[in-house]
């Protein structure tokens, strides 16, 4: 199968896609590709509502978070109707970057070993005192 050339690709603007956010016309964006899932709504294993919540917008992050199977990814290709216009790609909200925090190595040692050790010692002493009263 030959690769589709750029001139054969149908481009849609975000404004066009946003209009297709109801059960009679359900479009969404995955990785800058536009999908018409109207006929698939009732067949979707996760339910119609899942798709309708994302209709008219970018569902890439949610699609990836669910962890769809290879079969689902192959099936999705049959619903591609075009691509998001290159001028609108920068308008999509980008996922927030993960905040990475660093912990001082002494603090990590303290919280991982000393506090649990002291807690265990206190529990052992309380148990011993309780048993000694009997």
From Swiss-Prot:
UniProt keyword list: Acetylation, Electron transport, Endoplasmic reticulum, Heme, Iron, Membrane, Metal-binding, Microsome, Transmembrane, Transmembrane helix, Transport
Any one GO MF annotation of this record: heme binding
InterPro entries associated with the record: Cyt_B5-like_heme/steroid-bd (IPR001199), Cyt_B5-like_heme/steroid_sf (IPR036400), Cyt_B5_heme-BS (IPR018506), Cytochrome_b5 (IPR050668)
N-terminal signal peptide: none
Alphabetized Pfam families for the sequence: Cyt-b5 (PF00173)
Spans through the membrane: 109-131
Subcellular localization, as worded in the UniProt entry: Endoplasmic reticulum membrane; Microsome membrane
N-acetylalanine: modified positions: 2
In-chain residues carrying the UniProt-annotated modification N6-acetyllysine: 7, 10, 19
SUPFAM superfamilies: Cytochrome b5-like heme/steroid binding domain (SSF55856)
Residue ranges of domain Cytochrome b5 heme-binding in the record: 9-85
Cited SMART domains: Cyt-b5
Record membrane topology: Single-pass membrane protein
Entry binding sites for heme: 44, 68
PROSITE patterns with a match to the protein in the record: CYTOCHROME_B5_1 (PS00191), CYTOCHROME_B5_2 (PS50255)
GO cellular component, one term: endoplasmic reticulum membrane
PANTHER family: CYTOCHROME B5 (PTHR19359:SF150)
Family membership: Belongs to the cytochrome b5 family.
Descriptive protein name: Cytochrome b5
Organism: Oryctolagus cuniculus (Rabbit)
